[in-house]
């Protein structure tokens, strides 16, 4: 794992699911993390349920947290296991 990937994981530990009071890393809501030397980060966000009522909020919080990591220049986020995955993926990746 690269230094940037480790930094992203550490930052994601501060993103807490308000329903479970557990961070998104421990809940395994973020998977397939990859980062290159130019600061491009890719990962998959998998909400805890297919109809998770806070999926949008969590996705936004995750994206903001990753953006705060020094060295991160861009993000590509895949959404899986969610009823409106296509719509959320399009929305969350608009600003990249």
Regions found by a protein language model. Give the residues of each.
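Domain-level signature for proteins that mediate thiol-based redox and metal-cofactor handling
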Residues: 1-96
